[in-house]
């Protein structure tokens, strides 16, 4: 689990947006960056600054994954055929912790990683405790039977804050989620605008 878990909503203020679209975010009340004069900062941002912010925002959205892991994901996306920006989104969305979050089995990406680490999730009938594990289309994720009545699971399933995307098919009775296909950027229900093309520019420049 990320060391930033206890301060995850400070990330919203750091990047200047409520990136998870949650009502609990302090950014809803103080919509400026941290610091005494945060609300007064209106400096023009350079191209590099915009690219850096795009990278930080996307990296933070997926549970503030480490720079090393995020850069490795970019390198993999750049080596794949097709558009590197779209490839990057596809790789991030195919992470097990992302799919558990999309399926609404947990309330946050941070909770998804912890939930997986604690052995509450199976993939294709086998327990998996690696949040960064990569899923393939057709893979089935299931919450273990003994974990289905945990408070955070019930909270997430009943939350109106998020919709389940079309590329994840959920059976709420069996507590399964089938990863149907690799999504395009336009398919992903980000609460804020993500700019993976800027991320590509950051790493390739």
UniProtKB/Swiss-Prot annotation:
Keywords assigned by UniProt, alphabetized: Ribonucleoprotein, Ribosomal protein, RNA-binding, rRNA-binding
A biological process from GO: translation
The highest taxon in the source lineage is: Bacteria
Keyword check for RNA-binding: yes
Q: Name one GO molecular function term.
A: rRNA binding
**Matches recorded under SUPFAM superfamilies:** Alpha-L RNA-binding motif
User: Ranges for the S4 RNA-binding domain?
Assistant: 94-157
What GO CC annotations are associated with the protein?
A: small ribosomal subunit
HAMAP family linked: Ribosomal_uS4_B
Q: Which proteins does it associate with, and in what oligomeric form?
A: Part of the 30S ribosomal subunit. Contacts protein S5. The interaction surface between S4 and S5 is involved in control of translational fidelity.
Task: Indicate the family of this protein.
Answer: Belongs to the universal ribosomal protein uS4 family.
- UniProt cross-references to PANTHER family, sorted A to Z: 30S 40S RIBOSOMAL PROTEIN, SMALL RIBOSOMAL SUBUNIT PROTEIN US4M
Summary of the function given for this chain in its UniProt record: One of the primary rRNA binding proteins, it binds directly to 16S rRNA where it nucleates assembly of the body of the 30S subunit. With S5 and S12 plays an important role in translational accuracy.
Name of the protein this chain belongs to: Small ribosomal subunit protein uS4
């Amino acid at each position: 689990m990320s060391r930033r878990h206890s301060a995850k909503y400070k990330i919203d203020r750091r990047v200047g947006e409520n990136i998870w679209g949650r009502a609990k975010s302090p950014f809803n009340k103080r919509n400026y960056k941290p610091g005494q004069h945060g609300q007064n900062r209106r400096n023009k941002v350079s191209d590099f600054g915009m690219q850096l912010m795009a990278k930080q925002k996307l990296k933070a959205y997926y549970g503030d994954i480490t720079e090393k892991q995020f850069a490795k994901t970019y390198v993999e996306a750049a080596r794949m055929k097709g558009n590197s920006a779209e490839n990057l989104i596809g790789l991030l969305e195919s992470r097990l912790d992302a799919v558990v979050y999309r399926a609404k089995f947990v309330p946050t990406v941070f909770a998804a990683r912890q939930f997986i680490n604690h052995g509450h999730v199976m993939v294709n009938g086998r327990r998996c405790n690696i949040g960064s594990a990569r899923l393939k289309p057709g893979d089935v994720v299931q919450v273990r039977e003994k974990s289905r009545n945990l408070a955070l699971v019930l909270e997430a399933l009943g939350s109106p804050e998020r919709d389940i995307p079309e590329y994840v098919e959920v059976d709420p009775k069996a507590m399964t989620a089938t990863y149907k296909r690799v999504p395009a950027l336009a398919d992903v229900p980000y609460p804020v605008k993500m700019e993976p093309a800027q991320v590509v520019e950051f790493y390739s420049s």
